[in-house]
């Protein structure tokens, strides 16, 4: 059982190396551990998974206020104390950062999964509450990253701070140039974020010399709930792996459990 939290709580189950399901529950700071446990158990029941069959659990949390509540909820649901991704846990990743302990757990988990599934060098884009970009060099070192405002965060900020702009859906407009306010906003969100990703990739690739002077080209992997909305409009060749984080959690779990 793998769980990560942020704006949404992502819950999934992995059997051997296969992801059985991935679902999202809304993050609610007012909920008790019992309420979260009921939500987790309901999801398991929907997929006909008996909680007694769960043999292990791991959590990647970027919301400190919820760590203990989510941990207790998992214990109530499956009767297992979950592993927590964080300082002291084995990842197999060499992090060459000024403050390695400050690197977001999701960025680490994504990088671990990418190295295991796609190799190095690699650039990993995770489009969630924040849009993060992680860079792993040809020696499999985690060498840096980028953190941008997430797409929904940007839209919510735009709408809340401007009196005349409405909330919009995130479907693609007919043209890059809108003919009405809603399509203008959609173009800014969809094509603007795609252009941002392309621009950041250009700069990262150039800064690291990927693909020149004998250096291998970097594979570019994208994940997160909104990757499928933005990536099709990017000019770079980007592979979408919606299950990247759950795969990474399973790999890290295996590294930290005796007998694996």
Segments from the language model and where they lie:
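Conserved small/polar residues in nucleotide/adenosyl-binding loops
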Residues: 1-5
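N-terminal glycine-rich anion-binding loops that anchor highly charged ligand groups
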Residues: 9-17
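Phosphate-binding/catalytic loop of phosphoryl-transfer enzymes
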Residues: 72, 77-84, 89-161, 191-202, ...
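Residue-level signal for inorganic ion chemistry
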Residues: 11, 59, 128, 158, ...
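Short glycine-rich phosphate-binding loop at a beta-alpha junction
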Residues: 52-62, 81-83, 213-225
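Glycine-rich phosphate-binding loop signature in dinucleotide/nucleotide-binding domains
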Residues: 47-52, 117-119, 208-215
């Amino acid at each position: 059982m793998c769980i990560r939290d942020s704006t949404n709580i992502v819950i999934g189950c992995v059997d051997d190396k296969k992801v059985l399901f991935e679902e999202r529950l809304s993050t609610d700071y007012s909920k008790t551990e019992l309420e979260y446990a009921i939500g987790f158990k309901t999801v398991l029941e929907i997929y006909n998974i008996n909680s007694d069959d769960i043999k292990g659990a791991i959590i990647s949390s970027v919301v400190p206020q919820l760590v203990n509540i989510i941990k207790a909820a998992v214990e109530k649901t499956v009767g297992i104390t979950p592993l927590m991704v964080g300082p002291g846990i084995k990842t197999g990743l060499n992090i060459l950062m000024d403050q390695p302990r400050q690197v977001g757990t999701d960025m680490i988990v994504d990088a671990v999964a990418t190295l295991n599934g796609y190799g190095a060098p690699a650039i990993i884009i995770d489009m969630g509450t924040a849009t993060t970009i992680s860079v792993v060099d040809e020696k499999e070192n985690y060498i840096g990253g980028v953190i941008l405002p997430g797409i929904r965060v940007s839209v919510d900020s735009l709408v809340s701070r401007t009196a005349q702009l409405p909330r919009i859906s995130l479907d693609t407009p007919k043209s890059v140039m809108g003919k009405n306010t809603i399509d203008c906003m959609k173009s800014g969100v969809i094509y603007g974020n795609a252009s941002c990703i392309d621009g950041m990739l250009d700069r990262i690739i150039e800064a690291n010399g990927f693909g020149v002077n004998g250096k291998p080209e970097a594979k570019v992997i994208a994940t997160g709930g909104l990757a499928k909305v933005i990536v099709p409009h990017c000019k770079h060749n980007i592979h979408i792996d919606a299950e990247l984080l759950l795969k990474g959690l399973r790999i890290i779990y295996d590294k930290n459990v005796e007998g694996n």
